[in-house]
Amino acid sequence: MSSLSTLRILHSTAGRRWASYYGIYPKSAACSSSSVAIARFFSTAADRPPKHAMLSVENKVVAPPMVYIAGEEMTRYACDLVVKSWLEPYFDLSQWEYFDLSCVNRDNTNDQVLRDAVTAGQRIGAIFKEPTITPSAIQKKAFGLKNSLGSPNGAMRAGWNGITISRDTIHIDGIELGYKRPVFFERHAVGGEYGAGWSKVGRGTLLTTYLPSDGRDPFVVDKRDLTDQHNVVVTYHNPYDNVEPLAHLFFQRCLDANITPYVVTKKTVFKWQEGFWAVMKDVFDEHYKSRFEEKGLLQACGGDLQHLISDAATMQLIRWTDGGFGMAAHNYDGDMLTDQIAQVHRSPGFITSNLVGKAPDGSLIKEFEASHGTVSDLWNDHLAGKETSLNPLGLVEAIVGALQHAAVLDAEKNPDDEHKVKARDQIFNFTTTLRTAMHNTFRYGQGTRDMSGPSGYTTEDFVRKVAWRLQRYLDAQYDEAPPPQLGEPSRKLRRNYDIDEEAINGLFQKYDKNGDGFIDFEEFTRMLVKMNLAPLLTKKEKEKKPDV
């Protein structure tokens, strides 16, 4: 069968369905003219980045200044693999500032490294942080630490004037994880139990006294008698000056993503939480309500911004699996509710965690990290010489977010520097292509074992496979061919024909002989012959064909 015949099949209705769903993408140089035509079939010119936005191994881009905070254990190992395999081949990372926040290094420097990292973050404004360990008493002994180390997060939130911790669901086209559409969450970054002072006390009287800074007379906020022999007293407060910027960030993000916003408190019991809701509602009514109405985004919630009691929010998170909503809450409620979102959406590995603060000049400071920990169990397996299979998706989303924010800040600070503007465009093209390469690897059944089962790739093999696919996609951009855009069978097709996607995936694996996630011309031909779908030559065409 000729290359031209293949093109005719691809442009038929059935052919388009096969090509789109399976991502058939020619890889043989033997049919180069057809390869270009088939590649163009998958996208319009608008899908292809401009030439100046492309980069390659031979044309490294100087990455903009960024703070890179190293952590511990398996996630540190995985991030090292990712940076070496996916970033260093394409970027000069010499402008990044590195800080090692491992327990041992924090202990050796008496936590000066943490203070230095916070200072650098204030200055640069774009930070990536690997998961770190806040050592328990047992870990302190195991690591041989001199000092008791607290969580670095409090110092970071204070030093970067933290406003909110944005936690959003991560989605892979074609793979249903939990929520079908995005779910956004804004967690107030300061206040509450996380900054509390406390002490163990016995019987007595506890006074909480407020001393105004303007010289007014102090007064007692709370007085209580402690009659138990053993008590723990806790004091904390909730700063509300930054709730207004939190509201603007939240509502604008929901508006941009076309999702419906909700505000969560327990103000019916905790009367002091009324102020949070009041500020959010005022900002919404004055600046955003009409814009949400224009988009029809309030129809699902009675035509206005809705308040949810935190107890009710826990139930709705389980029920609203179609997604398409956002929530904003206090620090502690936000922590608990986003853990629940992670469970509905498969795992914390599919949730982002971005701290947003504000620099003195008004620009946003953004710190990006995965919402999971250091994955100690896999680290212990790795140290024991066992195979591991860590899904780095959350880590990579954080690196991508930090890299993009760094590029935006650098271009904004240097608007007349064409090299900075060009680098920003190149970085956004690269990160988009990286996401496509990583997501397609999962979709081809070549993911880690949490996604692909026992036959899934190891940590190292997955990184290598994505690196191979990333280079392939970037190289293809120079040839005017974009990364393949995998399409889903239409919902109408699924409904009418009861599509068995597992069986289809098995069929794809059967004909993808070399397991690279592509069906080339030869494999495609073999598949059509086996299925009795190959177009046959007419008698007239057969007579003309030479017998060789």
Swiss-Prot record:
Gene that this polypeptide is encoded by: IDH1
Organism: Phaeodactylum tricornutum (strain CCAP 1055/1)
GO cellular component, one term: mitochondrion
Biological-process GO terms, alphabetical: isocitrate metabolic process; NAD metabolic process; NADP metabolic process; tricarboxylic acid cycle
Enzyme Commission identifier(s): 1.1.1.41
Pfam families linked to this entry: EF-hand_1 (PF00036), Iso_dh (PF00180)
Family matches, as InterPro entries: EF-hand-dom_pair, EF_Hand_1_Ca_BS, EF_hand_dom, Isocitrate_DH_NADP, IsoPropMal-DH-like_dom
Recorded family membership: Belongs to the isocitrate and isopropylmalate dehydrogenases family.
Effect caused by changing D516A: No effect on secondary structure conformation or specific activity, but rapidly decreased activity with increasing Ca(2+) concentrations in the presence of Mn(2+)
Residues that hold NAD(+) according to the record: T132, I133, T134, N153, H372, G373, T374, V375, S376, D377, N391
SUPFAM superfamilies: EF-hand, Isocitrate/Isopropylmalate dehydrogenase-like
PROSITE patterns listed in its UniProt record: EF_HAND_1 (PS00018), EF_HAND_2 (PS50222)
Free-text remark on how the cofactor is bound: Binds 1 Mg(2+) or Mn(2+) ion per subunit.
Enzyme class per UniProt: oxidoreductase
Catalytic activity: D-threo-isocitrate + NAD(+) = 2-oxoglutarate + CO2 + NADH
Subunit structure comment from the entry: Homodimer.
Binding-site residues, Ca(2+): D512, N514, D516, F518, E523
Entry binding sites for Mg(2+): D311, D335, D339
Protein name: Isocitrate dehydrogenase [NAD(+)] 1, mitochondrial
Domain free text: The C-terminal EF-hand domain is required for homodimerization.
Superkingdom of origin: Eukaryota
Result after altering N514A: No effect on secondary structure conformation or specific activity, but rapidly decreased activity with increasing Ca(2+) concentrations in the presence of Mn(2+)
Domain EF-hand: 499-534
Keyword annotations: Calcium, Magnesium, Manganese, Metal-binding, Mitochondrion, NAD, Oxidoreductase, Transit peptide, Tricarboxylic acid cycle
UniProt activity-regulation remark: The homodimer exhibits allosteric regulation by isocitrate. Activated by Mn(2+) and Mg(2+). No activation by Na(+), K(+) or Li(+). Inhibited by Co(2+), Cu(2+) and Ni(2+), but not with Ca(2+) in the presence of Mn(2+) or Mg(2+). Competitively inhibited by NADH, but no effect on activity by 1.0 mM citrate. Strongly inhibited by excess ATP, ADP, AMP and alpha-ketoglutarate.
